[in-house]
């Protein structure tokens, strides 16, 4: 059966590719964008299967209206893709509070608002898929993009917990964590930055240079990512988190190895904070005994 999608940030970039892939699969799409005129070619090609909607994800009322449009137009909502987002490369010290808040509001609260509007519909249907387009930046960080990383780490934690809450009534939540994607994201993230204070040249300055050098050369193919999302939307089993791209996989492995090494280095302080009543030793022994059983605390 054809599905009904709501996709945020579908005017261009990855969101546009996701919308095109869903429509090519025979599904219907409520396509959210700040400028709906960008969606005119989709309407011309797919007609009534596309419902453009002006959607500023930082506006909770607009998120509710977009979900309502899906239900009113097609009778249900099967797939939500929270794709809208952007980054801003600038030292935290030099970034205005307004710019910081705008990134967090878009990349995190935008996800919260559309998800909050969609969950009641999916709960009543007893099915649905929610895809959060996060980033490898939700597992690791780079200098110069503090609000983006703050938001993406928040999306991961929020979605992990949400997945547990909604699983009993058939709703699947998957956080997608791509590496570099060949879109205009990097160019936009490096625009309108202040002149760096000299002290930040070694950290933020080097990241900006690398970002600009990779423009148009990122490994991630947005059309292939869109195809993966369409495939998962038709599956009864989805991962809670999915890394996308060899570059992302490599960086995550490096970050996890570095964290494990740091944790081991400072373990003497970690274990120094417990009561000395014998419980620590017994819990440690229990953990060792269950390490191969697949059980969880």
Predicted regions and their residues:
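Substrate-binding pocket helix/loop in short-chain dehydrogenase/reductase
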Residues: 91-92, 99-101
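A glycine-rich helix->loop->beta "capping" turn
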Residues: 48, 69-82, 88
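Active-site helix of classical SDR
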Residues: 115, 151
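SDR active-site lid
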Residues: 168-239
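The beta1-alpha1 cofactor-binding region of Rossmann-like NAD(H)/NADP(H)-dependent oxidoreductases
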Residues: 55-65, 97
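Residue(s) in the substrate-gating loop at a strand-loop-helix junction
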Residues: 135
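Conserved glycine-rich cofactor-binding loop
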Residues: 11-12
């Amino acid at each position: 059966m054809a599905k009904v999608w709501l996709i945020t940030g579908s005017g261009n970039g990855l969101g546009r590719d996701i919308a095109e892939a869903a429509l090519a699969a025979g599904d219907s799409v409520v396509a959210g964008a700040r400028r709906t005129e960008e969606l005119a070619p989709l309407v011309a090609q797919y007609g009534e299967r596309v419902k453009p909607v002006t959607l500023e994800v930082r506006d909770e009322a607009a998120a509710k209206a977009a979900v309502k449009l899906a239900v009113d137009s097609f009778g249900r909502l099967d797939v939500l893709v929270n794709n809208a987002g952007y980054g801003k490369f600038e030292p935290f010290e030099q970034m205005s509070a307004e710019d910081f808040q705008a990134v967090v509001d878009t990349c995190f609260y935008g996800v919260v608002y559309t998800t909050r509007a969609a969950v009641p519909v999916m709960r009543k249907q007893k099915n649905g898929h929610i895809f959060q387009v996060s980033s490898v930046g939700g597992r690791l960080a780079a200098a110069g993009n503090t609000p983006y990383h703050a938001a993406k780490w928040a999306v991961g934690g929020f979605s992990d917990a949400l997945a547990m809450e909604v699983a009993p009534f058939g709703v699947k939540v998957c956080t997608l964590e791509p590496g570099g994607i060949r879109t205009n994201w990097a160019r936009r993230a490096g625009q309108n930055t202040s002149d760096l204070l000299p002290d930040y040249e070694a950290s933020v300055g080097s990241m900006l240079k690398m970002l600009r050098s990779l423009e148009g050369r990122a490994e991630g193919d947005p059309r292939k990512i869109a195809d993966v999302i369409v495939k998962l939307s038709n599956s009864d089993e989805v991962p809670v988190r999915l890394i996308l791209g060899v570059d992302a996989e490599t960086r995550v492995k490096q970050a996890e190895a570095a964290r494990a090494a740091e944790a081991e280095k400072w373990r003497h302080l970690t274990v120094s904070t417990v009561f000395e009543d014998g419980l620590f030793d017994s819990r440690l022994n229990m953990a060792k005994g269950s390490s191969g059983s697949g059980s969880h605390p």
